[in-house]
Design a protein with these regions (language model features):
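Bacterial Sec-dependent N-terminal signal peptides
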Residues: 1-22
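Contiguous, structured surface segment used for ligand recognition
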Residues: 20-182
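The substrate-binding groove and active-site-proximal loops of carbohydrate-active enzymes
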Residues: 45-52, 131-136, 194-215, 230-241, ...
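Gly/Pro-rich turn-and-neighbor structural signature
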Residues: 75, 166-174, 237-238, 244-255, ...
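An acidic-aromatic substrate-binding cleft motif
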Residues: 158-210, 216-236, 404-407
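C-terminal non-catalytic alpha-helical accessory regions
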Residues: 164-170, 484-638, 644
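Catalytic domains of carbohydrate-active enzymes, especially glycoside hydrolases
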Residues: 211-239, 248, 252-261, 307, ...
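Structured mid-domain segments that build the active-site/substrate or prosthetic-cofactor binding neighborhood
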Residues: 226, 231-234, 240, 383-389, ...
């Protein structure tokens, strides 16, 4: 009995630990601080000497409070209000005064990394009777504290990127006490925008009018990263060049507080497109024959990133994410790294170890490491999963002593064999948790980077990844599903959380069986009834998602469609189409005239696939996400999507079916049981209403 009680207690404690302790409430009680009273918010005070990133976050807090209560608070730079919100960073003049007056314990923040504390303080300074004070150990700590306040007031980190509504509140109160999320477990935590054509690139073109991501786009990305308590970004690089396309990109990220890196095959803060666009001028990407030009290319990258916190990728791969030639040897690559560090020292006028660097052990580079190639002790060693979410190499006890630390490059999007995975989220929640927990347990805690493709529709795995990078110890096998439940409560409301979580968990599980790109008529066994079983499971899930969608308040429907309904409907329809194709082929071989009915079903499902995508691109959220769901996924014949458009699967028809021999009805007569089919038809009609 005692063991059972202990298990229950630990489960409850771990569930409560998924977020910072709740300090915001919406009903008055005792001596709670009135942040918003009867629709009137307190002003925000930021010292004029504060960091630009904190200023930007405070400006966003103004907008967040406006969304919550309908009135925008003032942003003050002088202490002229009886009650206010104060945000500041450890070491700034105003915060020093608070600490000197004994209002804040210096030990809480001294020497800490990206930590914030939030508490209500009486008489923090002359002219202010009471204030909610947010103090960060550094600028990002302050920024995280500001966004934590926003989140607890009801502003989702995904408010813009997934159109999550903000519920109105006339009163917002802060509970007494001191609150903090502590320090992050992983030092650098971020995302990689990758494989971004055609969806993200065309969405950006439509939304911002540019053929590249400019500073307006990256400001939105950086804000999301910071709201998720991340701090790191590998920008998109297929056809874009972050540093060169818009000089304001680097400045924007740096000011906001996001650290920029370049991907595993883009050394020395240079984007691949910068070389590719001038390949005729530069010559071969070959260090043995073109070292002088390449070294100058490297030098310009380091010169350009001066004054930022950016992390430098070192080493060298082939031209354009390709392997180096077979003649490449360890000695040559070690010489590349030696020269790169020499350039870093010459440009920065400091020892190379004072500039953060990472060496990506990706694909063939891991082979060089296994053959004995080594880099200096201060360099972060970046390992990789198998491109499909399964960690395949972790440091042993001796390797874990590497002073520079270890990182992990993890994928929820991939371009490569056996097929691309770019269309939908196919990552089971349990698999990501298990693999990242294993990663952390083996001491990989310096840098975590997630390949997120176009960013949408990977909203939930991005959230899970970032939360695990902040504090993986909060997760265990008993409480894991509380995380997606909390995510769903935040996006759709507490009353919808249980059902939305169940559907999110199931669709992630079902999609993890086989990606949409690899699915075809031969994936499951037709004769044993396996094909019908899995198709029915998905159609049942679609019916359940549609029921919830129809029950939602109108303001939640766009967010629900993006995060739950569309991925369920799109994959359910794909299963329906390929099952129908399998039945068509089977019955055609038997000269069964029902083959023609199944051919019709294939055509109907293929047309519906386009209709679902068109709705996502053009109708949902008023067309805000136009082009974000144009990824090809039907018609693969090799690993790549180098076919012109989605292609109707091959079907056969029996000519003159009335002359075919009479064949008894088969058990395969419907894609789903008739009652389920009728329910689905009814729900789909209500969805359109």
């Amino acid at each position: 009995m005692k063991k059972l009680f202990l298990f229950f207690y630990l489960s409850v404690v771990s569930i409560a630990a998924f977020a910072a302790e709740q300090f915001v409430i919406f009903t008055p009680a005792g001596n709670h601080f009135p942040l918003v009273a009867n629709g009137v918010p307190c002003p925000i005070y930021i010292d004029s000497s504060e960091d630009k990133g904190v200023m930007i976050a405070a400006g966003n807090l103004q907008q967040d409070i406006l969304q919550v209560c309908g009135k925008k608070p003032e942003l003050l730079t002088s202490t002229s209000s009886k009650r206010c919100i104060i945000a500041g960073t450890y070491g700034t003049p105003f915060i020093k005064k608070l600490m000197s007056a004994g209002k804040i314990d210096k030990k809480e923040l001294d020497g800490k990394n990206e930590k914030y504390i939030l508490q209500v303080i009486a008489n923090p300074c002359e002219g202010i009777d009471e204030a909610v004070v947010i103090i960060g150990s550094d600028r990002r700590g302050t920024i995280y504290g500001i966004y934590e306040l926003s989140e607890q007031m009801g502003v989702s980190p995904w408010y813009w990127w997934a159109d999550v509504p903000v519920m109105k509140q006339a009163n917002v109160y802060i509970k007494p006490g001191q609150y903090s999320d502590g320090e992050p477990a992983v030092t650098y935590r971020g995302i990689f925008l990758n494989d971004e054509a055609p969806c993200l690139t065309r969405w950006v073109k439509h939304t911002y009018g540019t053929n590249y991501g400019d500073h307006r786009f990256y400001a939105r990305v950086c804000e999301l990263i910071l709201r998720l308590k991340g701090n790191f970004l590998w920008p998109a690089m297929w056809s874009w060049a972050f540093y060169a396309d818009d000089p304001q990109n680097s400045k924007t990220a740096s000011e906001m507080g996001v650290i920029i890196g370049t991907s595993h095959h883009e050394p020395m803060a240079r984007n691949h497109q910068e070389w590719s666009r001038k390949r005729k001028e530069y010559g071969a990407w070959d260090y043995t024959t073109n070292q002088k030009v390449i070294d100058q290319f490297f030098r310009e990258g380091i010169e350009r990133m001066q004054g930022t916190e950016d992390i430098v990728t070192i080493g060298m791969r082939g031209d354009g994410d390709a392997a180096m030639s077979k003649s490449t040897n360890v000695k040559l690559l070690e010489n590349v790294v030696k020269n790169q560090r020499k350039i870093i020292e010459e440009v920065t006028k400091r020892p190379a170890k004072e500039t953060p660097q990472v060496w990506a052990l990706y694909k063939e580079v891991l082979d060089y490491y296994d053959k004995g190639m080594r880099v200096p002790d201060d360099v972060i060693m970046l390992l990789c999963d198998d491109n499909w979410g399964n960690v395949c190499r972790l440091p042993n006890a001796k390797e874990r002593k590497h002073p520079g630390g270890w990182g992990m490059y993890y994928h929820v999007d991939y371009v490569g064999a056996p097929r691309n995975s770019k269309w939908l989220n196919v990552t089971p929640i349990q698999n990501m948790w298990e693999q990242l927990q294993l990663t952390y347990d083996y001491g990989v805690e310096k840098l975590w980077i997630l390949n997120v493709g176009d960013l949408k529709p990977m909203e939930y795995p991005i959230t899970l990844f970032m939360d695990m990078a902040w504090n993986p110890k909060q997760f265990n096998v008993s409480n894991l599903l509380e995380h997606p439940r909390r995510f769903c409560a935040q996006q759709f409301g507490e009353d919808q959380a249980d059902e939305a979580m169940r559907i999110l968990n199931l669709y992630s599980k079902y999609n993890g069986r086989v990606t949409g790109e690899m699915l075809d008529r031969n994936t499951y066994n037709l004769e044993t009834g396996e094909w019908k079983q899995v198709s029915d499971e998905y159609l049942k899930l679609e019916a359940e998602a549609l029921r919830q969608y129809i029950s939602l308040k109108p303001e939640y429907k766009d967010a629900y469609k993006q995060l739950i309904l569309f991925p369920v409907q799109a994959m359910a329809n794909l299963y329906e189409m390929y099952y129908a194709q399998a039945m068509n082929h089977k019955l055609y071989k038997e000269n069964n005239p029902q083959a023609n009915e199944w051919a019709d079903k294939v055509e109907q499902a293929f047309a519906r696939d386009k209709a679902l995508s068109d709705d996502y691109n053009n109708i949902m959220s008023g067309g805000k996400w136009k082009n974000m769901m144009i990824q090809k996924h039907i018609g693969y014949t090799s690993w790549n999507d180098n076919f012109p458009a989605d292609t109707l699967p091959k079907i056969y028809r029996i000519e003159n079916p009335e002359k075919a021999p009479e064949i008894r009805n088969t058990v395969w007569r419907a894609v789903a049981p008739e009652p389920l089919k009728r329910v689905l038809d009814r729900l789909r009609s209500l969805q359109k209403a």
